[in-house]
Amino acid sequence: MIKKIGVLTSGGDAPGMNAAIRGVVRAALTEGLEVMGIYDGYLGLYEDRMVQLDRYSVSDMINRGGTFLGSARFPEFRDENIRAVAIENLKKRGIDALVVIGGDGSYMGAKRLTEIGFPCIGLPGTIDNDIKGTDYTIGYFTALGTVVEAIDRLRDTSSSHQRISIVEVMGRYCGDLTLAAAIAGGCEFIVVPEVEFNREDLVAEIKAGIAKGKKHAIVAITEHMCDVDELAHFIEKETGRETRATVLGHIQRGGSPVPYDRILASRMGAYAIDLLLEGHGGRCVGIQNEQLVHHDIIDAIENMKRPFKSDWMECAKKLY
């Protein structure tokens, strides 16, 4: 029977992580469980840096960006000896189960703990929206608003100078954030990992737009696709139009979470406690068609596929 749980945030931070922690803590306390907060993700778990959390520990947290528990990347957690120390720390603290909030790297850590018999629940916290088994991740909608606002501002100056602007958006190897922001921001061209990219084809499309009378354009591109400064230089050379690249960077991860992210995080946090009390471990939480769902975390990582929104891409092309 579960009496005490731990909660940690891991990997890149996302707006709404604090709301998720709050959801976990308050739901657990309501059910009579104790909660230990673990600082700095798996690193803090390995180093045994924890704190007991009560209702007041998470007061005034629902609207705050970032994560008050801190986060860190800790690739050393792949080492079974490191994980053995982490498990020993959990047992020493009397922790019976763990809630992990983060992206796919965080899920891998939870998967490894699950494989050696420690109950874990994963909550999808990442702006990339690249987690399998869920329509949306905690932080995605806040980041989307941040990116669209940046695109709106870039359009103002691009229009003034009749310039081509390239905006690089986070997402790692998933184009969801780029695609949604590009549609909402009215971008003329979209470059995402799921669709084959050729810079000569992009230039041809830009030239076609210029021939139709377009005075400026915005190209939205997912990070890691190419060097955007080099791409800007190439476009300017081929089109004769001034072209500048803007890398939005970590500003996309910050800021107060929008209402949907707060609600999603709160619901998922409370749902994680429901699952643990029902005897579920080794699960990851998602939302599909606005209904909370849970999947086997090992199956989700190893077997599930995340479909690309090809219909969104087709829509975007019609709006160029």
Swiss-Prot record:
Catalytic residues (positions): D128
Broad enzyme group: transferase
The EC number(s) this enzyme carries: 2.7.1.11
Entry's Gene Ontology molecular function annotations: 6-phosphofructokinase activity; AMP binding; ATP binding; fructose-6-phosphate binding; identical protein binding; metal ion binding; monosaccharide binding
Source domain of life: Bacteria
Binding residues annotated for ADP, in chain numbering: 22-26, 55-60, 155, 186-188, 212, 214-216
Function comment: Catalyzes the phosphorylation of D-fructose 6-phosphate to fructose 1,6-bisphosphate by ATP, the first committing step of glycolysis.
The protein's name: ATP-dependent 6-phosphofructokinase
Organism annotation: Salmonella gallinarum (strain 287/91 / NCTC 13346)
